[in-house]
């Protein structure tokens, strides 16, 4: 309906246009034929316009062909709207034939064919080959990236990567190809084969197998059960022994050792009662073991354990006790056993008893005192006191005074406790010896011995009582001295304490002390009143003549220069125990003296200034002298260029920037770039680090054994790559990593025939080049 309406509207418009165009285009006198042709033309235009409208929904109208008057063989009319005939329309007969089918196939093949492309140039083909080969190789190599990354990130690489399992050949194979050649080997093999010893380690020996064959089934089972039980018990005992061996408790091992010793002693007593001959043999074995211990240097404090304990003995009480036990063991082993005969025992009589009453420590101290080492006298003060009390009890106060002056600090109570313990042990030993000697000696000798032992015991009691009183009095003095002012401390002590000053250790004077003494002598030349000092010195010089000048020097050193002009008397005597400030001053002086002695023959300051002058001169820019002898004047041997010519051709260097250490006299700053240090500097942040402060922190952290433990030092300095000597390092295989290389047939085809490239390869080449 819409199409009809449009057609009517278009007809109306066309009629109006015709009416409008009549007076312009055509005259009234024109012929009717021309009008008809023009109408047909416009009508045809109108139909074409209508057919072009709404072509999608337009319905095809059936056209009717009319027979024409003139039929030409060259102008065949075709069905439909097409004006030209197609070859396919002519080939469509009523019935299909095979010949027409082949023609159709040929036509379809001709239609599918296109124009042949021009072949590529040789350069383009080679470039495509290179690109394809590069992409293929990169794809193959990219599969190794995880392996390479893993090896780079590893903390340590040990080559060869594959651990070769050692091939352990059984002993049968080894023995089959080996024969005994030397006579010793032949004898050993003959003995083994004679006794039917197995070459391997079977479960049962041939003897056991023969015994099993002779047994019944029940007996064999019982025997096997016994063997299993014995092996199980053996494994249990071995495991227990391993556990006990791992125990590090010294107390546990000491208890076990004592238990074993007691058990061995009981067994020896039982053996002595049952079988005396076997007991004698056992005693000989024990004596032989003791001789072996004496021959070895096990208890000489020269081993690694003893040295480590000696270092820690100052701080660790257990280490001190262990060292003491080892020393006592050494003394016990090195002591010679004196076996006296019966005649000597009868002749000795009372002399042996009297010698036994004297303690061994006194004899040792007396022997040491006569020896060539006088420095050992100070370490044996307690022993000398005991010897002095036994020789002359009246000199006891003097010896006590000497001992108190020499012992300092915390060592005093320890020495006193050791003395008391030693006294107690001596009493007990004396009591035992007296009990043993009562049965063997007559009554007369017994009385003399009892009287001698009573005297010794009384002396020891007096000694212990005096030590206790001295200890209490020293405590009271120490508490009272804390409240006494400094002036009272410097007052002269009574005559009984004179040995305290005499026993004070001497020290070498330093240069600073000599300077201070020089200053003090200047003050002394001014004739200051010193009556007290002179009086005290006059009293002491007759008693101790040789030590007087040394004491005078020490007393002068202890004088305070600030108190010289005061009315108070200067200090004469110092305390026996030095104060903390005095100890600190002495340490500083010793340190300075040590430095002076180390650099005694070196003028360090002068050498330093000379070195700095040389460094400054070397850093200054140098003048360039361009004078050439013989240019413009005579030249030769012995002739030098004139000064005028030198000034003319001398290029003076500009002054450089001021040095950083110009105003620092004690410092040399090297402004040159260190080539050796530059080799270790980095311009780019290394791989594992993500920020510069991480790298700086690792560089600043010391890795030496001085600042780290041994285990940390070894971990920090482990090499990146470790190779085992004697092993062949083979390259990594794809099968080891778990990757199999793909087939490269395409590349092989291209490389074999680069000139003949199929369409498939061309497409692949284009695709690879685009990618």
UniProtKB/Swiss-Prot annotation:
One Pfam family of this chain: Utp14
Sequence ranges of Acidic residues compositional bias: 342-355
Subcellular location: Nucleus, Nucleolus
UniProt crosslink position (Glycyl lysine isopeptide (Lys-Gly) (interchain with G-Cter in SUMO2)): 122, 449, 519, 733
Family matches, as InterPro entries: SSU_processome_Utp14
Record keywords, A-Z: Citrullination, Coiled coil, Isopeptide bond, Nucleus, Phosphoprotein, Ribosome biogenesis, Ubl conjugation
Composition-biased stretches (Basic and acidic residues): 399-436, 504-529, 547-557
A Gene Ontology cellular-component term: nucleolus
Annotated segments matching region Disordered: 23-49, 334-355, 367-557, 740-771
Modified-residue entries (Phosphoserine), positions: 29, 31, 52, 77, 81, 405, 407, 437, 445, 453, 569
Tissue spec. comment: Ubiquitously expressed.
Subunit structure: Interacts with DHX37.
Function in brief: May be required for ribosome biogenesis.
UniProt similarity note: Belongs to the UTP14 family.
Name the record gives this protein: U3 small nucleolar RNA-associated protein 14 homolog A
Organism: Homo sapiens
Gene from which the chain derives: UTP14A
